[in-house]
A protein has these predicted regions:
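Core catalytic alpha/beta fold that binds nucleotide/phospho-ligands
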Residues: 1-238
């Protein structure tokens, strides 16, 4: 199942197209993936693990849907490959900013509609109490834990939102930070109305937050995160 929506959020000019693709069975994914450019199919075959290959295909299908929705007429005939750091990158000049993330069961792609947007970062994680507990133990400071408890006393969803916000900011700003938990600090997490323009499209949003992230002496970075459909999503831009 594919959902396509547009949203505005702090830090990114214009609208951002957001695509969520619930990963179908491998056979169906391979069938749909056959429509991708040869260069993308070659990259997919470089993954020996079927799960990694399926995630790659789902991500490329999602980002092409986003590019088409954003009005980029080259998206149907040109591949989205990789840059020197392994990040997804359209192979044509003047392409919009994009980002891709995935879990075992879904892929998410973000595409900017504004040429002035320099970069986007999207992340997604499934909601899992064991994952939240591990993050609290290994990657979240006592100060951050207090902030999270104010918006999520059970500390199940907010820790994952914090992690996704960090990941989204790392992608947006091209940070090389190693172990994120020791260098990126969330300084604010504020409940907010969701930024999706139409909540009737099947997102089933339960909560949303604006999150401020700090790294060394940089200006504060911002991400918008939300809980929907059993997962947490986060988006950042500049």
């Amino acid at each position: 199942m594919m959902r396509i929506e547009r949203m505005h959020f702090e830090g990114a000019p214009g609208e951002t197209v957001l695509v969520e693709l619930t990963t179908p069975e491998s056979a169906l994914l391979a069938r749909d993936g056959a429509r991708l450019h040869e260069g993308e199919r070659t990259l997919a075959q470089s993954f020996t693990a079927p799960a990694r290959r399926d995630a790659f295909l789902a991500g490329r299908l999602a980002v092409h849907a986003g590019l088409a929705n954003a009005g980029d007429s080259r998206a149907h005939r040109m591949p989205v490959l990789r840059d020197g750091r392994g990040r997804p990158q359209p192979s044509w000049a003047d392409a919009p900013a994009i980002s891709i993330a995935h879990t075992k069961i879904r892929a998410v792609a973000a595409v900017s509609t504004a040429r002035t947007c320099k970069a986007l970062g999207v992340d997604v994680e499934e909601i899992d109490a064991h994952r939240a507990e591990a993050l609290l133990r290994m990657a979240i400071s006592p100060e951050e834990r207090k902030l999270l408890a104010e918006v999520d006393p059970q500390l199940v969803v907010a820790p994952i939102a914090l992690w996704c916000a960090r990941e989204a900011c790392v992608k947006t700003h091209g940070l090389d930070v190693g172990w994120f938990g020791s260098v990126l600090q969330v300084s604010s997490i504020q409940p907010t109305p969701p930024r999706l323009t139409d909540a009737a499209t099947g997102w089933d949003i339960e909560a949303a937050w604006n999150i401020e992230v700090r790294f060394e002496s940089r200006a504060p970075m911002h991400a918008h995160a939300w809980q929907a459909n059993g997962a947490v999503f986060a988006l950042s831009g500049r």
